[in-house]
Amino acid sequence: MAGPGPGAALESPRQLLGRVRFLAEAARSLRAGLPLPAALAFVPREVLYKLYKDPAGPSRVLLPVWEAEGLGLRVGAVGAAPGTGSGPLRAARDSIELRRGACVRTTGEELCNGHGLWVKLTKEQLAEHLSDCSLDEGWLLVCRPAEGGARLVPIDTPDHLQRQQQLFGVDYRPVLRWEQVVDLTYSHRLGSRPQPAEAYTEAIQRLLYVPPTWTYECDEDLIHFLYDHLGKEDENLGSVKQYVESIDVSSYTEEFNVSCLTDSNADTYWESDGSQCQHWVRLTMKKGTIVKKLLLTVDTTDDNFMPKRVVVYGGEGDNLKKLSDVNIDETLIGDVCVLEDMTVHLPIIEIRIVECRDDGIDVRLRGVKIKSSRQRELGLNADLFQPASLVRYPRLEGTDPEVLYRRAVLLQRFIKILDSVLHHLVPAWDHTLGTFSEIKQVKQFLLLSRQRPSLVAQCLRDSESSKPSFMPRLYINRRLAMEHRACPSRDPACKNAVFTQVYEGLKPSDKYEKPLDYRWPMRYDQWWECKFIAEGIIDQGGGFRDSLADMSEELCPSSADTPVPLPFFVRTANQGNGTGEARDMYVPNPSCRDFAKYEWIGQLMGAALRGKEFLVLALPGFVWKQLSGEEVSWSKDFPAVDSVLVKLLEVMEGVDKETFEFKFGKELTFTTVLSDQQVVELIPGGTGIVVEYEDRSRFIQLVRKARLEESKEQVAAMQAGLLKVVPQAVLDLLTWQELEKKVCGDPEVTVDALRKLTRFEDFEPSDTRVQYFWEALNNFTNEDRSRFLRFVTGRSRLPARIYIYPDKLGYETTDALPESSTCSSTLFLPHYASAKVCEEKLRYAAYNCVAIDTDMSPWEE
């Protein structure tokens, strides 16, 4: 009876088209702040639950019935169940006694909190079991999180089976699930149709309720709230994320890390980097997952990296028991089953590789696959919506947690329908059709899609090219580039900028040489080799990354006090005025017509998206939205560019005539100033036409249009370059925030994130250098940590792996500066007298030692 889940095959084109119709209508409702289609909120009035048949259990079970205040979600009702607080349960009001195999009738209204999954009973349903019950409604706990399964299982009711209708020789059972009601409502069919079961109208109305002040922006905030708390799937989980919370490994190399276990690509592999016979993969399983088969992908061509003997352990915490011991055929290329037919949920499964072929020291695994029978999922937890959790979401604060919970349930249903058809819409759907454009209007909702990550990965794989047969070698003079950066007016053509030197160096030398297409596999992580003139360096990646960082700094300087050495971007008015939000941002220069270089910038952005490198461009959401194809608006997006102008026009719109004439007199004409300080006419001859009070609405409209479109051509050129490297389907599937993060990296460099990415080699755990190092980084600002990251790795944003070794002086206290090798992302850490000295030396090195000292070698050309 269940409708198709995400990614499942739909029964017919009719069902597919019906769901597309539904999505289009729902998207329009969301944008307009209207109630969603009623079919999405369907709740049956009656569901029959049967007591789970456990032969080892008692023949009779008492099921406690709890009373809930109001609708069952009240903040501050500590101990109340169900509710938004999941503290100790207070005493139940009554109990229902059932024999094993007996049934209880409930409504279809459900609620999930920290105690588990609850279902609601009406007064009539309670009376079937309790003759003197005084409750108007009650709640039964169907499933606890720790049980790994439901004590009560929903089934078809006998009444439903008796009411089956014989229509055209087909038995039509009344439809119970909301997915089926959506299909019935929006799929056209000839002849008689199944009918939905009797609806629980009160529950449906509660789900559909939209507060009077609710807007589409509130829904977007709710989606981001859910994503922050639920939706950030571990990027390393890939193909097993529906079963696994997280994957940990004993060790890994930077290039062949844990993500390779689940990328569904047999050409990649996880490779350990540790001691012999101490390799393991630990899976933290999602609640309710029971493993039917656990498979490892191996390849005999890995020689002595191939696992020979694997032992699997499982259980809770540190209490793991041996489950299987498997010897692997040394000639195998493919999957080997190392665990099967489990009957209970195991929170932790640990795969230990105890022996490799030919006594190999390290191991390679090309994949982990799981086949599972998922027990009933508990659903969205109502406890999430406590006021303390909503501080970062002002639009949601003050809204009843009960309303937020039910709205979130409805949005999750919408996402489930979207997931079921997403692979039909992208990339094959005609983008000119209205339906697709309507769905794109709610792109932020894709954050919660389970199908999207695999679709993005597949689109990128399908469009990638082979890596170049040779690596371009570029000769870069950074001394001239530094002189240009200090005084750009001496070099108006910007020939000495690193950006220009790289651009010219990558041009094909003759008509037969193909230009770089930047669509390489992710593992091709050095796009060109740099020879820095008058600097000794063997570039194994560090010099290349430094050139990207230099170009980023030239395009969008991080300091507001330095001139902008290239003409492609200009500082926003907010940065110049020191007002409003996003005061460190840049926008494309409306006066710059060098569209070929804008296109190349777009190609570099696409290459960064495909690979592991970053091109850090400080652009506001106003620009990223245009690049990703999202709609921009004056009120939402332009305050990040020129907040003073936005406020001025807002005041002008509502001002009276006397105030307007006093403030503007005859000085305001039909002109406006663009971001590059260029004055443009809004109408022909606008310089000489005064704006009268009656003309102000037209003037405001013209200013908004001119400013919103001021860099339209430049953005279009960047997008054209981006689309040469990244398929349109990928941009359709990514939100603008995700596009920015994939191109630029994570601007927030936290100590917690650095701890996960930092590895100490040849240090004792008690070494004071380790303690001083973390104390120093804790005292750093985010800018300090970003500078430090670049000093060590050549990257200024995360993620970036760091390896730390003792310096050559060992334990001798010194005041020497730390050294780094960006090619290997290595820091050589001296022994300092105190954490304060360590902090000072690290900070000085981060800001003043950007040259690659330890990569030096004699070089003469």
Swiss-Prot record:
Its EC number is 2.3.2.26. Residues 219-397 form the DOC domain. The modification N-acetylalanine is found at A2. It is an enzyme of class 2 (transferase). It comes from the Eukaryota. It comes from Mus musculus. Interacts with TRIOBP. Interacts with STX8. Pathway: Protein modification; protein ubiquitination. GO terms for molecular function: syntaxin binding; ubiquitin-protein transferase activity. E3 ubiquitin ligases accepts ubiquitin from an E2 ubiquitin-conjugating enzyme in the form of a thioester and then directly transfers the ubiquitin to targeted substrates. Mediates ubiquitination of TRIOBP and its subsequent proteasomal degradation, thus facilitating cell cycle progression by regulating the turn-over of TRIOBP. Also mediates ubiquitination of STX8. One of its GO terms (cellular component) is perinuclear region of cytoplasm. It is found in: Cytoplasm, Perinuclear region. The lineage of its organism: Eukaryota, Metazoa, Chordata, Craniata, Vertebrata. Keywords: Acetylation, Cytoplasm, Phosphoprotein, Transferase, Ubl conjugation pathway. Residues 512-857 form the HECT domain. The gene is Hectd3. PROSITE patterns: DOC, HECT. SMART domains: APC10 (SM01337), HECTc (SM00119). SUPFAM superfamilies: Galactose-binding domain-like (SSF49785), Hect, E3 ligase catalytic domain (SSF56204). This is E3 ubiquitin-protein ligase HECTD3. The active site is at C823. Pfam families: ANAPC10, HECT. The modification Phosphoserine is found at S12. It catalyses: S-ubiquitinyl-[E2 ubiquitin-conjugating enzyme]-L-cysteine + [acceptor protein]-L-lysine = [E2 ubiquitin-conjugating enzyme]-L-cysteine + N(6)-ubiquitinyl-[acceptor protein]-L-lysine. One of its GO terms (biological process) is protein ubiquitination. CDD domains: APC10-HECTD3.
